[in-house]
UniProtKB/Swiss-Prot annotation:
Residue positions, PTM Asymmetric dimethylarginine: 114
Record protein name field: WD repeat-containing protein 13
UniProt keyword list: Methylation, Nucleus, Phosphoprotein, Repeat, WD repeat
Taxonomic lineage of the native organism: Eukaryota, Metazoa, Chordata, Craniata, Vertebrata
Cell compartment(s), UniProt: Nucleus
WD repeat feature ranges: 170-210, 215-254, 302-341, 406-446, 451-484
A GO biological process held by the record: negative regulation of type B pancreatic cell proliferation
Organism: Mus musculus (Mouse)
Amino acid sequence: MAAVWQQVLAVDARYNAYRTPTFPQFRTQYIRRRSQLLRENAKAGHPPALRRQYLRLRGQLLGQRYGPLSEPGSARAYSNSIVRSSRTTLDRMEDFEDDPRALGARGHRRSVSRGSYQLQAQMNRAVYEDRPPGSVVPTSVAEASRAMAGDTSLSENYAFAGMYHVFDQHVDEAVPRVRFANDDRHRLACCSLDGSISLCQLVPAPPTVLHVLRGHTRGVSDFAWSLSNDILVSTSLDATMRIWASEDGRCIREIPDPDGAELLCCTFQPVNNNLTVVGNAKHNVHVMNISTGKKVKGGSSKLTGRVLALSFDAPGRLLWAGDDRGSVFSFLFDMATGKLTKAKRLVVHEGSPVTSISARSWVSREARDPSLLINACLNKLLLYRVVDNEGALQLKRSFPIEQSSHPVRSIFCPLMSFRQGACVVTGSEDMCVHFFDVERAAKAAVNKLQGHSAPVLDVSFNCDESLLASSDASGMVIVWRREQK
């Protein structure tokens, strides 16, 4: 069963940064050999139930051995070899829909593990339950993350030395999305309502635009990097999604929206990058197989409005979708079939578009509950706690920003798990980039970057937080350099 061995490899890859932290070559050899063995064993035809049991036990054992994970972007930053060893090009992608064992699984309903979030919480608490409040993490697992995070306060850590570079190739058209490549310090991409996507390289100096991806006939609303960064998926107002090769910028495939509607957002399934979820203007969410260009059977659902934002949890079992009428829906994602099952609905505020959703399974040692960061045109940034394994949400706190009409986005900072406090970053219609400490009871504002001349729509950190990119409604992309302590 191809999907299961990919999930096992993904679990191993997430923990790989913790193996022999001072000898990265050993980690590279390990994950390559692991990939080879898993591929060979996948052909042996073991029963799917046995494979799933192995996956579950493997995850539990790794969790007990190495402790709770920080987010993939921070943990894997120490091991770029993981990316190379788990490349997912179209040539090597498994045909998800044609897998006979996956097809056979459709004959019965397969639910998500009911204890997945409880297990995560137990694993997280186990490391800390006997420690006094405020004590440092007492495990060797913390060394790498503490070294990357440093011993400075949040205010000191998020002091910026100024602008590193300004990209203006999309000037006069909004840039709704900017993203650094996964586990990469210097590769950046941004999409524009002029219908193109830019792939940029920040090092060696001077920063350059490597490729401009053209093909969409209307504005590009969103895009996403694959885990291995070799593929990008983009969605457009021209009612198509496109698959691009990042190495040379060529379009590999164009896939029309099943409803013929404007496509407004997209995200990769984090465990199986053969699947991408898209949201459209006809209120629908679709799971798409990018190898076949087809919609996955059972992988569609309808919301109450235009789908503007999507986000998976780290294991890929929960999906949240936000619409322009103020609702956030959670879905259970069946790993075997790609089927979506609608679970919960939260009305953030009736009539207020939900423009951004960012999920984080483990914010910091002071905030270990799975969390969701939401922008919703309320002049507030909202932080929710995920309270059960069906994605139900409970408001934890809010932060004041200016957002009443623009599609502003926000992110969790990637290296926050072992700091005192935890930081989030958001754009704003006041033309500034805002930093907030989610654990600080009063005066949560940590920093504010000024330099844009239009509402800031999106923000993105590179893997080690040395650079931050922000994009605005006038088409400007600013790369900020963090002050070195």
